[in-house]
Amino acid sequence: MRYAPRLALILLMVSAGRNVFAANNVPVPAHCAPQVNQKLADLLAQHPRQNVDNVMACGIATQNTQVRRGGPHGSHHITTIAVKLPNGQTVNVQIVTNDDLDGPVTAQANDPVFAYGQGYIANGRWAAGIHDTHCSTHRGADNGWVVVAGVKTPKSCANFR
C-alpha cells in the first residue's frame, strides 16, 4: 500500500502521455474536388526528398489494383489514381496499402478513391504516391485511411498509439 501513490502517479503520467501523442482522425471529404488535393499539389511543387505526413488525395482509379507480393515489409496493393490538382493539371498518383497493416485494399478501374497518409515523390509513371494509409505508427502522423467506392479501410483507429 505504501507504493500506491507512486503507482497512481505513474499511471496518470502514462495516461496523459498517450493523449499528447494521440493521432488525429481526419474525416473523409464529402466529395472529391481539386482543393482536396492541395497538400499533394504543394508536395509536388516543393519536391521534398523526405516523405511528408498527412497528405490527402482523391481521384479515379485508372486501372485495377496491382499486387506486389513479398518484400521486407510484406505484400502491398498499388492503386493508380488520376488526381486533378487545384491548378487544373491532372497527375497519376500511386496509393500503396500494406496487406499486413491495412488488409488487401483493391479498386477496379473507374472506382472513386480517397487516400490519406504519408506522401512522397514517385518516379516513372507516377508523379507522387501516398502510403502509410493505416492507423498511425509514428509521432506527427494522423491516422491514415483509404476509401474505395465508398468503403473505408481501416474502419476506425484507437485514439492513442
Question: What feature does the model see in each segment?
Answer:
Residues 15-17:
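N-terminal signal peptide c-region/cleavage motif recognized by signal peptidases
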Residues 2-9:
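Sec-dependent signal peptide recognition
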Residues 21-161:
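OB-fold and OB-like single-stranded nucleic-acid-recognition modules
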